[in-house]
Amino acid sequence: MKSDIHPKYEAVVFNDLASGAKFLTRSTVSSDKTIEWEDGKTYPVIDVEISSESHPFYTGKQRIMDSAGRVERFNARFKGFGKK
């Protein structure tokens, strides 16, 4: 078995820039930025623009974008489709 071919797997803090939430998890990504976590230890921190804390799908704040009534037009066009 080859040695030293696997990436370093370590504890990392992910910082959600949209909501301000922080997650301590393990990952192979690394960063020069560090942060002191609640346990008093210092961990590398990765800034992410969106996570499950701020994504509309997970927060329940998703909206269906209907541009120019396309959904209504589709429903009107195929209203009786498949019925005999």
From Swiss-Prot:
Keyword Ribosomal protein: yes
Alphabetically ordered keywords of this record: Ribonucleoprotein, Ribosomal protein
Gene Ontology MF, one: structural constituent of ribosome
Pfam families on file: Ribosomal_L31 (PF01197)
GO BP: any one term: translation
Family (UniProt): Belongs to the bacterial ribosomal protein bL31 family. Type B subfamily.
Identification of the protein by name: Large ribosomal subunit protein bL31B
Source organism: Renibacterium salmoninarum (strain ATCC 33209 / DSM 20767 / JCM 11484 / NBRC 15589 / NCIMB 2235)
Phylogenetic placement of the source organism: Bacteria, Bacillati, Actinomycetota, Actinomycetes, Micrococcales
Gene that this polypeptide is encoded by: rpmE2
